[in-house]
């Protein structure tokens, strides 16, 4: 069954934006919105491991934030969330390139309605801090979702809002077939961000969840 056979398009306004959202129905039953959560990188000891800083490993933080987010979404019957790494030992691909390709393949073949990739940042300058969200293109559903997620994270965690940015070269943004975004939660190399990334992983997940809820007009 394809989405077009069950899709209902309507126009609504959320926080001043004119938006078109697809709400999926089968008969009189609303179908769950499918969100693919990509926890960036692979476990320690394998290819495509992440950044490090202040004793923290990116791949460990992204894994746990993703688990928290999936649990929040899957406890709401309006959503169906899947993880790229359902266990902390899950390894995707055999090289950096195939690791990224596997994440995209999983999302496209499901197929997901939205794709959210979770990462942590680093910088040689330890004073650089804050949250950033990357998109393939502006004036899209991904941008509107990203703005609400950014607001949610800043409210829940208190990181600096570094804005919504374009990076169409990112593989997971340019090869996915649905609205996609990549969140850099904060900088592992900044002491303040690192403390938040260590202690506030559930709050990061809840901020993302809150943004998703607001995007759909559920909160």
Placement of each model-derived feature along the sequence:
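Sec-exported extracytoplasmic/periplasmic mature domains
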Residues: 67-78, 108-112, 150-158, 209, ...
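Conserved beta-strand segments of alpha/beta enzyme cores
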Residues: 80-82, 163, 179
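Active-site-adjacent mobile loop/cap segments within catalytic or ligand-binding domains
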Residues: 33-36, 47, 105, 110, ...
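Short, Lys/Arg-enriched N-terminal segments with co-localized hydrophobic residues
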Residues: 9-30
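Extreme N-terminal basic, low-complexity initiation segments
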Residues: 2-8
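Catalytic-core regions of hydrolytic enzymes
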Residues: 25-131, 135-144
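Active-site-adjacent substrate-binding region
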Residues: 140-166
């Amino acid at each position: 069954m394809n989405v077009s056979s069950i899709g209902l398009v309507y126009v609504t306004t959320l926080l001043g934006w004119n938006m078109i959202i697809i709400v999926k129905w089968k008969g009189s039953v609303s179908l769950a919105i499918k969100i693919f959560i990509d926890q960036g990188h692979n476990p320690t000891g394998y290819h495509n491991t992440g950044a490090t800083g202040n004793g923290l490993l990116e791949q460990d933080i992204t894994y746990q934030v993703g688990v928290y987010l999936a649990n929040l979404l899957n406890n709401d019957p309006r959503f169906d969330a899947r993880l790229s790494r359902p266990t902390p030992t899950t390894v995707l691909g055999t090289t950096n390139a195939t690791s990224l390709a596997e994440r995209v393949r999983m999302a496209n073949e499901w197929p997901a309605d939205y794709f959210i990739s979770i990462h942590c940042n680093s910088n040689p300058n330890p004073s650089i801090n804050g949250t950033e969200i990357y998109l393939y293109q502006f004036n899209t559903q991904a941008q509107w979702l990203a703005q609400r997620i950014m607001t949610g994270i800043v409210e829940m965690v208190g990181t600096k809002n570094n804005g919504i940015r374009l990076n169409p070269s990112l593989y997971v943004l340019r090869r996915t077939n649905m609205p996609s975004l990549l969140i850099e939660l904060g900088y592992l190399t900044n002491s303040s961000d690192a403390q938040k990334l260590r202690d506030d992983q559930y709050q990061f997940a809840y901020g993302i969840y809150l943004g998703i809820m607001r995007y759909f007009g559920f909160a």
